[in-house]
UniProtKB/Swiss-Prot annotation:
Gene Ontology MF: a single term: actin binding
Region Disordered, residue ranges: 115-213
Protein's name in the database: Ponticulin-like protein J
Lipidation (GPI-like-anchor amidated asparagine): N212
Location(s), subcellular: Cell membrane
GO CC entries: plasma membrane; side of membrane
Post-translational modification: The GPI-like-anchor contains a phosphoceramide group, rather than a phosphatidyl group.
């Protein structure tokens, strides 16, 4: 009877460990634009957020920029691309990817050395963020960096398209998809008669990936439990 109870306990522990959600944290990673210039770097053991973005290097197209927003509660970096479609101030925005995303179905963005796992948002999905998220956008008049509380830009577009926002808890679970991990938009210079929109995947470098090795800790804990159960049988 005692052996049966121990076996049941081991099965319960195994199921609990198998269903545990792995959350990814990133000590250091950087984002490069289509011209292979580093425009954002998150350094280990610092509080770097979107205020550290080199917005001039992230600029794409005509009057556009990449925007990186970090939620202090959810600790998620949301990468967006703001580009002017006709160089007149009319802007469009598109969510590229969210990193890190505590979703089991997170996709992998491979770099030269390591792999970082981020979640992508479907086009029609909502961005779950907290009230304290910060935004950095490119000022088209004087190229200065500004902080804004949400995802809206200060321009008055004819038909703006901004992601929906709402409040979320600390661990927001965003729906992921395996397509379009990142995209960038380019606009032709003024000398051309029309603008061209190209969607490319910006490179992402990650020097140190998963900061907390949840898998190894769970495996160690399971071995200790099994050893104690086996020892109790003798």
């Amino acid at each position: 009877m005692r052996l049966l109870n121990n076996l049941i306990l081991m099965v319960v522990l195994f199921v609990a460990v198998s269903n545990a959600t792995t959350k990814f944290t990133f000590n250091t990673f950087s984002v490069r634009n289509t011209e292979d210039q580093t425009c954002f770097t998150k350094t280990a053991k610092t509080t770097d957020d979107s205020t550290k973005v080199d917005i001039n290097k992230c600029t794409v197209g005509c009057g556009g920029s990449m925007k990186i927003r970090k939620g202090t509660k959810s600790q998620q970096y949301q990468f967006e691309l703001f580009s002017s479609t006709d160089c007149t101030g009319e802007t469009t925005s598109k969510v590229l990817f969210v990193c890190p995303n505590p979703s089991i179905d997170a996709i992998s963005i491979k770099s030269t050395s390591n792999t970082i796992k981020c979640g992508t948002l479907p086009p029609d999905s909502e961005i779950k963020e907290d009230d304290t998220a910060t935004a950095v956008v490119n000022d088209e008049n004087n190229n200065e960096t500004k902080n804004e509380p949400k995802t809206k830009t200060k321009s008055t577009p004819k038909s703006p398209s901004t992601p929906k926002t709402n409040n979320s808890n600390e661990d927001s679970d965003l729906t992921t998809s395996s397509s379009d991990s990142s995209s960038s938009t380019k606009s032709s210079p003024k000398s051309k008669s029309s603008t061209e929109v190209n969607e490319n995947k910006p490179k992402s470098d990650n020097e140190t990936a998963e900061g907390n090795n949840a898998s190894s800790n769970i495996a160690t804990f399971s071995l200790v439990i099994i050893s104690l159960l086996v020892a109790s049988l003798f």
